[in-house]
Amino acid sequence: GQVEGSELLNSQLTALSFSVDTNHIYITSGTQVIRNGNDTLRLDEEGNLVYHALAGESTRYRLPLRLSDQIEECRALAQATVGALCGDGRLYLQQIRLAGETLVVEFGYVLSGAQVQVGSEGYAAQFVLEAEQITQFTLRYRRYQAAPEQALVLPELQAAAALQALGRSGQELSLVYTDNGGERLTPAWYTAGKGGA
């Protein structure tokens, strides 16, 4: 489920290295906005928090030179924020990609050993790195509770048999939960690079 608004924002300012005393806070179209110097935080009603730094004008999230250290800094920030509040969920490194001079690092949620697909993008936290600093990030705050196995998903053996009947035997099955912002996650079996089974 979703994590609530202003209480969430207040609790996360310290973890995000924002001083409560020096912030200008206002609300626009249901989104809470905090400006601090050249940095902006926006928290929408769905529990999505977006940070933007004015390019080259912020020093809030400076990073070490080594790539592995940069990724570790992103992991630590994700763990201190969305990872600390996700209930029974856990974070994992989902993807690292290079887009020109920009590095994008994404972390996803996992619940009871299965990946959680959050919205259409899928990630729990995304960090954009440019010139040894984080210039933008998106944090999707969710709180998950593991439930006993339910009969809502086709048992693994039956899902494998269905794949074989479709001529796709030998492909690896993965259980994925879809989080569309509702109270419950939707489970489904997926094959690598394919749709649901």
Predicted regions mapped to residue ranges:
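Broad, structure-driven detector of short, well-ordered beta-strand segments within folded domains
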Residues: T31-R35, D39-E45, A125-L129, S169-N180
